[in-house]
From Swiss-Prot:
Catalyzes the conversion of biologically active 11beta-hydroxyglucocorticoids (11beta-hydroxysteroid) such as cortisol, to inactive 11-ketoglucocorticoids (11-oxosteroid) such as cortisone, in the presence of NAD(+). Functions as a dehydrogenase (oxidase), thereby decreasing the concentration of active glucocorticoids, thus protecting the nonselective mineralocorticoid receptor from occupation by glucocorticoids. Affinity towards corticosterone is higher than cortisol or dexamethasone. InterPro entries: NAD(P)-bd_dom_sf, Sc_DH/Rdtase_CS, SDR_fam. It catalyses: an 11beta-hydroxysteroid + NAD(+) = an 11-oxosteroid + NADH + H(+); corticosterone + NAD(+) = 11-dehydrocorticosterone + NADH + H(+); cortisol + NAD(+) = cortisone + NADH + H(+); 11beta,17beta-dihydroxyandrost-4-ene-3-one + NAD(+) = 17beta-hydroxyandrost-4-ene-3,11-dione + NADH + H(+). It comes from Bos taurus. Keywords: Endoplasmic reticulum, Lipid metabolism, Microsome, NAD, Oxidoreductase, Steroid metabolism. This is 11-beta-hydroxysteroid dehydrogenase type 2. GO terms for biological process: glucocorticoid metabolic process. Belongs to the short-chain dehydrogenases/reductases (SDR) family. NAD(+) binds at residues 82-111.
Length: 404
């Protein structure tokens, strides 16, 4: 097909014009992303000249250039000014790191901790400004929640509270849902769901007054059935759905709601191998004899070993999560969901677009290898993998994959 240079020229006039305007407003991120975008446009230009009519080529090039430059625009940020933010779960991990960053940015930070004498609390007291206030709170105790809510109402400016960061969370046991006591599910719901619900409802009058932000740290375990995280994942699923409701209902008030879905990061609780060993022993000590005989102690040992191995590969740098929380608090148009960390795109793609059998097999191989309980083993001593049992049984008449 005949080459048409004028669509190319028209598009390359429009794109640099917008880029120049963004540069003048300091609204364009420079560096490798910009170079990659220009290379993409050049390749697309070459294809359009050879494959499309002139008007179609101009439309495709101009639209692509406009979209690319929009994605490269620096997100507009609101000034910190005298904004106040309350963060739960600041003893360690994401909450602790976020409290320190927001304090350095000039926020008034109300940081709740489980223990005022914990290492994380002492660190915050030592390194942060006098604007940061430490508040003791256990989300399973209504009295603690009421005290923090009352303190916040008294000590926030007349404009109200700008942001609430629901960060506190808990995971207790790593085991099949049948092996976890019902009390474990209740505890996870109390901390991860009902605690966040009470804090959000209690602070909504202040947040509505300021047209502020609600930022909630959830988990991919609430979106997909990771093996052996049923209690934790169920509570996070309920939490994410609740925040979706708040997002719709608070829209007329100007309150924006964001959910953070981080990958696995190396927080203090993740690194605490002794804690996971203690919880495993606690589970074994309280497990009914019938379940212990059916599953076997070696099965639970294996699950915890695999879980600790997966945690050893956790991401050490917490800044992507802290940056996501900060953006949700200050961006003029924050995202509804943030996915900080590597590998989440692939996991969500598999979860949403592949057949259910493949999804379940992937989650098992990604997180915990499919070893079988003692009662299902084929008579061999020790652990036997599901693959070994399948080989012993010979080929099945139905070759279609089944979920483990």
């Amino acid at each position: 097909m005949e080459s048409w240079p004028w669509p190319s020229g028209g598009a390359w006039l429009l794109v640099p014009a917008r880029a120049l305007l963004q540069l003048l407003r300091a609204d364009l991120r420079l560096g490798r992303p910009l170079l990659a975008a220009l290379a993409l446009l050049a390749a697309l230009d070459w294809l359009c000249q050879r494959l499309l009519p002139p008007l179609a080529a101009l439309a495709v090039l101009a639209a692509t250039g406009w979209i690319v430059l929009s994605r490269l625009a620096r997100p507009q940020r609101l000034p910190v000014a005298t904004r106040a933010v309350l963060i739960t779960g600041c003893d360690s991990g994401f909450g602790n790191a976020t409290a320190k960053k927001l304090d350095t940015m000039g926020f008034t930070v109300l940081a709740t901790v489980l223990d005022l004498n914990s290492p994380g609390a002492l660190e915050l007291r030592a390194c942060c400004s006098s604007r940061l206030k430490l508040l003791q709170m256990d989300l399973t105790k209504p009295g603690d929640i009421s005290r923090v809510l009352e303190f916040t109402k008294v000590h926030t400016p007349s404009t109200g509270l700008w942001g609430l960061v629901n960060n506190a969370g808990q995971n207790i046991f790593v085991a099949d849902a049948e092996l976890c006591p019902v009390a474990t599910f209740r505890t996870c719901m109390e901390v991860n769901f009902f605690g966040a619900l009470e804090m959000t409802k209690g602070l909504l009058p202040l947040l509505r007054r300021s047209s502020g932000r609600i930022v909630t740290v959830s988990s991919p375990a609430g979106d997909m059935p990771f093996p052996c995280l049923a209690a934790y994942g169920t509570s996070k699923a309920a939490l994410a759905l609740l925040m979706g409701n708040f997002s719709c209902e608070l829209l007329p008030w100007g309150v924006k709601v964001s959910i953070i879905q981080p990958a696995c990061f190396k927080t203090e609780s993740v690194k605490d191998v002794h804690q996971w060993e203690e919880r495993k022993q606690q589970l074994l000590a309280t497990l009914p004899q019938e379940l212990l005989q059916a599953y076997g102690e070696d099965y639970i040992e294996h699950l915890n070993g695999q879980f600790l191995h997966s945690l050893s590969q956790a991401l050490p740098d917490l800044s992507p999560v802290v940056d996501a929380i900060t953006d949700a608090l200050l961006a003029a148009q924050p995202l509804r969901r943030y996915y900080p960390g590597h590998g989440l795109g692939l996991i969500y793609f598999i979860h949403y677009y592949l057949p259910e059998g493949l999804r379940q097999r992937f989650l098992q191989s990604f997180f915990i290898s499919p070893y079988v309980p003692r009662a299902l083993q084929a008579g061999q001593p020790g652990l036997t993998s599901a693959r070994d049992i399948a080989q012993d049984q010979g080929p099945r008449p139905d070759p279609s994959p089944t979920a483990q």
